[in-house]
């Protein structure tokens, strides 16, 4: 099973790239973590936010390979603790499909992305900066994998 993060935004600070790479390289060959960056729409004083969300959503959904399970990262989604995320990984593995996790831009996800999703996950009730979310997601998914693999990374 492949895990795919599809995130709005490019040109992240170096610490984000390094943090993401540190965790993504740790994944086993049979469960690689891939990041696909979607160019954010131009936001200005008179920007049409609904149109920007629509365009970003179209680009995100176009990046999802056919047949993948789509999971959105959204504040109103279901909160999972680390053990619950590990359980989700096991469920996803049994489903025998790759998983695409959608991370929206500053205004969130388009209605089309939310409709296409089979699951919605709330990483936190806090609003987190999008660069930080990439690193937290990579670490959280790695930690969940470590639980399923009985790897000593996670300690209770």
Swiss-Prot record:
<dbReference type="GO" id="GO:0005737">
    <property type="term" value="C:cytoplasm"/>
</dbReference>
<keyword id="KW-0808">Transferase</keyword>
<dbReference type="InterPro" id="IPR029028">
    <property type="entry name" value="Alpha/beta_knot_MTases"/>
</dbReference>
<protein>
    <recommendedName>
        <fullName>Ribosomal RNA large subunit methyltransferase H</fullName>
        <ecNumber>2.1.1.177</ecNumber>
    </recommendedName>
</protein>
<feature type="binding site">
    <location>
        <position position="73"/>
    </location>
    <ligand>
        <name>S-adenosyl-L-methionine</name>
    </ligand>
</feature>
<keyword id="KW-0489">Methyltransferase</keyword>
<keyword id="KW-0963">Cytoplasm</keyword>
<keyword id="KW-0698">rRNA processing</keyword>
<comment type="similarity">
    <text>Belongs to the RNA methyltransferase RlmH family.</text>
</comment>
<comment type="subunit">
    <text>Homodimer.</text>
</comment>
<feature type="binding site">
    <location>
        <begin position="123"/>
        <end position="128"/>
    </location>
    <ligand>
        <name>S-adenosyl-L-methionine</name>
    </ligand>
</feature>
<keyword id="KW-0949">S-adenosyl-L-methionine</keyword>
<dbReference type="GO" id="GO:0070038">
    <property type="term" value="F:rRNA (pseudouridine-N3-)-methyltransferase activity"/>
</dbReference>
<dbReference type="InterPro" id="IPR029026">
    <property type="entry name" value="tRNA_m1G_MTases_N"/>
</dbReference>
<feature type="binding site">
    <location>
        <position position="104"/>
    </location>
    <ligand>
        <name>S-adenosyl-L-methionine</name>
    </ligand>
</feature>
<dbReference type="Pfam" id="PF02590">
    <property type="entry name" value="SPOUT_MTase"/>
</dbReference>
<comment type="function">
    <text>Specifically methylates the pseudouridine at position 1915 (m3Psi1915) in 23S rRNA.</text>
</comment>
<dbReference type="InterPro" id="IPR003742">
    <property type="entry name" value="RlmH-like"/>
</dbReference>
């Amino acid at each position: 099973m492949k895990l795919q993060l599809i995130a709005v935004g490019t040109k992240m600070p170096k610490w984000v790239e390094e943090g993401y790479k540190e965790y993504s390289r740790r994944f086993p060959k049979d469960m690689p973590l891939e990041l696909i960056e979607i160019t954010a729409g131009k936001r200005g004083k008179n920007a049409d936010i609904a149109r920007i969300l629509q365009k970003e959503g179209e680009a995100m959904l176009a990046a999802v390979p056919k047949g993948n399970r789509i999971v959105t990262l959204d504040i109103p989604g279901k909160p999972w603790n680390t053990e619950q995320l590990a359980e989700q990984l096991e469920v996803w593995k049994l489903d025998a499909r790759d998983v695409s996790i959608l991370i929206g831009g500053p205004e969130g996800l388009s209605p089309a992305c939310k409709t296409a999703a089979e699951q919605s996950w709330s990483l936190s009730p806090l609003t987190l900066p999008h660069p930080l979310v990439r690193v937290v997601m990579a670490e959280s998914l790695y930690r969940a994998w470590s639980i399923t693999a009985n790897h000593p990374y996670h300690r209770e």
